[in-house]
């Protein structure tokens, strides 16, 4: 890949999990960002332990050569929380803008079961009605316009347990929104949802022109099989090791890197692989991911 086009980041979720704060609660902010830099990454997404005052956060990252590239934002358009979502988005956007980020990764969380004690591989996830889809599309088009006014871009993070998880749901969303709304492509969630590498790559191929942010996440199929067999929740699966870093699971990332490179992708690739840090030392796994990417992507 072209190192002038692609930058590498890593998310703090491998060190401490915002959905399960007990995982990695002992890992401090300064330890997290220091280990990111030591492992060879130049970017980070934002976690709950990060100071939210840019005047405090930026110098602490600058000294380590780390730049903020994105931060998760939850939207609730389908269930009618338009005004509240937009107000909170503006504050979130202004923070990211102050930090120099260009991308705002969003997830439509109306009815999401990702944090609930419900089987993640079943029929418990939300399925939006036509009216709800319209609310989502109109909401995201508004966010896209607001972001563009700041020189930024909004992208939708397809995610397990949400109303925009499957290939069909991604297709529906992308057909309804305008050109100012992009897709955050997540290898792990695509593989997990669709059950393999071929459908994962099909999503990537189809939406290359609309992808502005990439999450690199590997999966462990034996754990996914257990999640399916035992009716486990998303978070139970995470604790058992559903996800891991690139090079440690089943996904061959070389076709992913080739597709992005051939298209001329410009932006961040983010190692975003949540697992229990007590079982998978975050620094060791960050180093493992960085080595794998260097060997397979050439950057």
UniProtKB/Swiss-Prot annotation:
Its EC number is 4.2.1.44. SUPFAM superfamilies: Xylose isomerase-like. InterPro entries: IolE, IolE/MocC, IolE/XylAMocC-like, Xyl_isomerase-like_sf, Xyl_isomerase-like_TIM-brl. Transmembrane segments: none annotated. It catalyses: scyllo-inosose = 3D-3,5/4-trihydroxycyclohexane-1,2-dione + H2O. It is an enzyme of class 4 (lyase). One of its GO terms (molecular function) is myo-inosose-2 dehydratase activity. It holds the Pfam family AP_endonuc_2. Its cofactor is glutathione; Co(2+); Mn(2+). GO terms for biological process: inositol catabolic process. The keyword Manganese applies. Keywords: Cobalt, Lyase, Manganese. Belongs to the IolE/MocC family. HAMAP family: IolE (MF_01672). This is Inosose dehydratase. It comes from Klebsiella pneumoniae subsp. pneumoniae (strain ATCC 700721 / MGH 78578). The gene is iolE.
């Amino acid at each position: 890949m072209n190192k002038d086009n692609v930058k590498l980041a890593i998310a703090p979720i491998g060190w401490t999990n915002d959905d399960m704060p007990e995982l990695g609660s002992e890992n401090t902010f300064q330890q997290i960002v220091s280990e990111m830099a030591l492992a060879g990454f130049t970017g980070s997404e934002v976690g709950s332990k990060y100071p939210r005052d840019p005047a405090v956060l930026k110098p602490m990252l600058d000294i380590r050569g780390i730049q903020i590239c994105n931060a998760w934002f939850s939207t609730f358009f389908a269930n009618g929380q338009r005004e509240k979502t937009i107000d909170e988005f503006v504050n979130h956007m202004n923070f990211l803008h102050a930090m120099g980020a260009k991308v705002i990764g969003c997830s439509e969380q109306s009815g999401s079961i990702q944090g609930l004690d419900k089987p993640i591989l079943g029929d418990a996830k939300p399925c939006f009605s036509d009216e709800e889809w319209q609310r989502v599309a109109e909401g995201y088009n508004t966010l896209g316009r607001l972001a563009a006014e700041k020189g930024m871009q909004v992208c939708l993070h397809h995610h397990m347990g949400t109303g925009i998880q499957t290939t069909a749901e991604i297709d529906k969303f992308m057909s309804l929104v305008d050109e100012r709304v992009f897709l955050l492509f997540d290898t792990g969630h695509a593989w997990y949802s669709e059950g393999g590498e071929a459908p994962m790559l099909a999503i990537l191929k189809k939406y290359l022109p609309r992808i502005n942010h990439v999450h690199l996440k590997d999966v462990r199929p034996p754990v996914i099989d257990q999640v399916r067999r035992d009716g486990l929740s998303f978070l139970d699966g995470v604790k058992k090791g559903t996800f891991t870093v690139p090079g440690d699971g089943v996904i061959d990332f070389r076709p992913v890197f080739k597709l992005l490179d051939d298209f001329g992708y410009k932006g961040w690739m983010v190692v975003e692989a949540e697992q229990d840090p007590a079982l998978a030392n975050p620094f060791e796994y960050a180093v493992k991911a960085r080595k794998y990417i260097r060997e397979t992507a050439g950057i």
